């Protein structure tokens, strides 16, 4: 049997987005024991605003919602440099390949069909958060800025890294090149 994933999610916050109050109540209660904070949004517009204001560590969202659906939410988050690093898991009753492909094309990190088990959702969440932490540690320990084509996760990430690399290359000889300058 594979080793159990023991990644601790208790220091993290999660944003749950769904227009079904019964499901959000269930998820808030179920996920509350695993997370420091569980925030609820009833549609993509509210979720995008909460994400920009509070930057949750991970987002779990329904696809079919009023005002802004889950695909549009993914796209909005992944195009915003300030929050594009936040993993998004889509939950939906739509299990056809076209729906899944649309989710991934718009930036979803994972796609889970309803009905689902909390244990399955938690494993996906743990894996995504653990991967993010591993990437952070790798770059903090090495001090290297990754080349965009090696480890880009979104278009916004790639744009940021290209701009950062260009600034560093253009000012490499400058005595003013430091963190404040960048």
Feature annotation, model-predicted:
Residues 25-33:
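Charged docking surfaces used in two-component/phosphorelay signaling
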Residues 116-125, 137:
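C-terminal output helix
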Residues 35-42, 50:
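Short hydrophobic/Thr-rich beta-strand motif most characteristic of the beta2 strand and flanking loop
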Residues 65:
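Receiver (REC) domain active-site loop signature in two-component systems and cognate sites
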Residues 54-60:
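Active-site beta3 strand of CheY-like receiver
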């Amino acid at each position: 049997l594979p080793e159990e994933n023991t990644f601790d999610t208790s220091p993290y916050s999660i944003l749950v987005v769904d227009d079904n109050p019964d499901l959000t109540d269930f998820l808030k209660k179920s996920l509350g024991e695993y997370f420091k904070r569980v925030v609820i949004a009833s549609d993509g517009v509210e979720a995008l605003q909460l994400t920009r204001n509070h930057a949750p560590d991970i987002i779990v969202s329904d696809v079919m919602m009023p005002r802004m659906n889950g695909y549009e939410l993914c796209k909005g988050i992944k195009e915003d440099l300030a929050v594009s690093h936040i993993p998004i898991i889509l939950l939906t009753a739509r299990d056809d390949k076209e729906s899944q492909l649309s989710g991934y094309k718009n930036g979803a990190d994972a796609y889970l069909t309803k009905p689902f088990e909390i244990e399955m959702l938690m494993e996906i969440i743990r894996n995504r958060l653990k991967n993010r932490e591993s990437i952070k540690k790798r770059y903090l320990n090495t001090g290297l800025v990754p080349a965009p084509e090696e480890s880009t996760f979104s278009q916004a990430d790639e744009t940021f890294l290209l701009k950062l690399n260009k600034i560093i290359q253009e000012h490499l000889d400058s005595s003013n090149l430091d963190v404040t300058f960048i």
